[in-house]
Amino acid sequence: MAEYPALDIEIAPPAGDSLYDRLYALLDDYQPAAIDPAEDGGHWRVFFRTANQRDAAFAALAAIREVRASAVEVPDEDWARRTQEDLRAVEAGRLIVAPPWDIPRGGKAVIVIEPSTGFGTGHHATTRLCLLLLQQLDLRRARVLDVGTGSGVLALAAWKLGAHDVVAVDNDPDALANARENIARNGAAAAIDIIRDDLDTLRIQRAEVVMANLTGAVLVRYAEELHSLVVKGGYLIVSGFAPDDMAVIARAFPAMKVIAEKREGDWAALTLRL
């Protein structure tokens, strides 16, 4: 039976203002396959492709005194069983994000997501916040870029909301495979382009709407690259940071104006306009 090398991380309450950003930024250096945070933010399970990556991340976590980590091996069937037990359809405004085993009938537009290593099942606050901010924009005839697409959920939401040209970008081949499956599952394979690239090498036509559900540290580091992807008068939706860090994120984009914000628990999201 296949097993995933993983870390179980316990975060001591109360979490500091920038602790989640620090943790995400540290883990990002070791290329996790998936980060699965509990809704209260106090426990994370982080999956890796190799035990070497997991073990290196485990050693690095010693630098963050607010967390305790343990190395585990998670059987493939445990992941599947847990997701089917725990994940149900989630509403976000006019949209519903649902796993294949809990698809609701009628009413709102449904995005079907098969949980895998691509982040974005709709259960984490950052995904929901991005979905809600996206629904505040008129996407008809818009070109939309989803940078760090993960499961493809935000790209699919843009398509469902009327965007005529959607591009999903990620640097993780496993996430892109999951995104490709989800996009096909929702009948959008011909409507959404999928690109493997990094922000510092991405060369692509600019868009009216750019979404980046990443981490605060990554958003600040690649602020110039994200800014360059937005057309004049266009919008940038960002999430993956704490409410107390909203000002820091806004200052990273000095040419853009914050026009909307949302918060949920320990997470926040912003819409900026160029």
Give the predicted meaning of each segment.
Residues F241-L274:
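Active-site capping/gating segments
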Residues I111-V112, L145:
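Conserved beta-strand elements of the Class I
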Residues L176-A177, L219, M246:
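Short alpha-helix immediately C-terminal to the canonical SAM-binding loop
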Residues T117, T121-R203:
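Conserved SAM/SAH cofactor-binding pocket of Class I
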Residues A223-K232:
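A short glycine-rich, Lys/Arg-flanked "PGG" loop and its adjoining helix->strand segment in the class I
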Residues A2-K108:
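N-terminal auxiliary segments of SAM/dcSAM-dependent transferases
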Residues G233-F241:
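Conserved beta-strand signature within the Rossmann-like core of class I S-adenosyl-L-methionine
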Residues V210-A212:
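Hydrophobic beta-strand segment of the Class I
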